[in-house]
Amino acid sequence: MRSTIASRDFAAIAARVRKIGALNRASLPAVLVMACAFAACSGQEGPSAQLPAPPESTVQAPVDGDWWKQSGDPVLVDLITRGIAADHDLACRGARLANQAEADASADRRLSGRMRKLVGTDQGLSRAASLRADQYAYAQARAARAAAVALAYVEVRRLQKVLVLRTERLDQFRDNAAIAEFRRQAGLVTAIDGGIGSSMAGVADADLAATRARFDRARSELARMTDMDDAALLTALGETGDVPDLGRDPPGPADQGPLHRADLLALRYRLLARIEHEKMTQADIDKAEATRGDPSTPPLLRDGLGELDKAEADARAEIGATRQALVTLDAREPALSQSGERSRRAVQDARSAYRAGMGDFATLYVAEASALSVEEARL
């Protein structure tokens, strides 16, 4: 049974933690991986579970929790794997969590631990909730690292593609300039065409050099993040700059259900650990839930619930902004595609007309520059 913590119902959370007991500490590696999906965390329920099933998320995460493994881009998968492994702070946090889980499990097995449980002085539930919070915080940090590497990779690919486009366009500009000079020498046009052609090639050459410098800087940063040699990274990237289609579904209606995010789950378990440590009653929790912001509410509950509310509101605002950006992108893409097709036809017509002596160089210049702008805008 999926043990997703789906709401701020602390009664259900506390009951679930008490039922799980030690939160299945032996399953730490699975928890660390699954929680990273910002979705459900698979736990082990007791045989007498009577809690109602939590609401299901409308967004299903990959089975193993690592979204990049479903991207269809082996270069991205390799770079994120390297980037996570190269983050020494993240590795240390994972090792500490594994050691803490083993230490807690060992303490529970000792006679003194069992005696503390019998006499009611054990803080095992508080420690268990705190450990689970640390696990989700680790998962959040791991996911953030993966996202940072992915964004750096996409920027490198974008600049690589721009570099390819501008290199191709520079070759065309130089060809146009050569044709203009030939026609000037033949007395067919004035020197203005040759001057414009040389200026076009010079500007394109400068833009290409600036793009190459930005590409080198972005690639250097990606190599640093993934602990790779620059030559090895260049080999892995290849020459085209193409990125496989990730198969993103179009954004649907906003999901107002519970947010299955590791950062929010970490906050909830952190608060639960403090509640258990302070031995607060279920009545305290219910009252705080019913009278949010009441000055008479214990500060621990009042501030903790306020922090959760703010974190969830911020998360929903972030999701809403991302959703709107995707909607805008979906509306923009067809228009850019049509503009790109029109601009390519315009370039072909202007080039043919100029070579046939039926068009002017200024028209060709504008057509070439417009086509390049549209192609780069699509990136």
Predicted features, each with a name:
Residues 94, 121-128, 191-199, 361-369:
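Short, charged, amphipathic alpha-helical segments
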Residues 92-107, 141, 148-164, 218, ...:
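Amphipathic alpha-helical coiled-coil segments
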Residues 86-87, 186, 356:
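Charged, alpha-helical scaffolding/interaction elements associated with membrane systems
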Residues 42-155:
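Short flexible linkers and secondary-structure junctions
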